[in-house]
Amino acid sequence: MPPHRDGGQAQFIERPVADEGSPWLSKLLEWVQRHLTDDLTTGRLARQACVSKRTLARRFLETTGTSPADWVTGLRIALAKELLETTTLSVEEVADRCGFGSSFTLRHHFRKRLQTNPLAYRAGFRVPEVG
């Protein structure tokens, strides 16, 4: 079920922010947000952070409690939620703008993480028409 606020006000989810004590992660987070539509493999993230894939995975787990792939998927889901809340883009267009590659992949991750589909999520943010 999508988040809800009384009065028809959409509830916006802030983007995750890296811990100030992790400058390497802050820099990587900024880079990833500029490249969300790219193919962001763990190898590519490791190269960007100038570390091995193993070091990246270990540091990620220590700092965020999750894997790099789950982290990127979370960023993409957050962007998809924002677009669904604030635009009339089709699910296909939202998937493309978020880097999912296909609407099928977006729906898969949406259902897995939010137990709903993109259209049902969007419907939770429509303001009911009066009269």
Where are these regions (language model features)?
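A short, charged, Gly/Pro-tolerant segment at domain boundaries
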Residues: 1-7, 11-12, 125-129
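Basic, amphipathic alpha-helical hairpins
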Residues: 4-9, 20-41, 60-64, 81-90, ...
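HhH-family (HhH-GPD) DNA N-glycosylase catalytic core used in base-excision repair
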Residues: 13-18
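Generic C-terminus detector
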Residues: 107-108, 113, 120-129
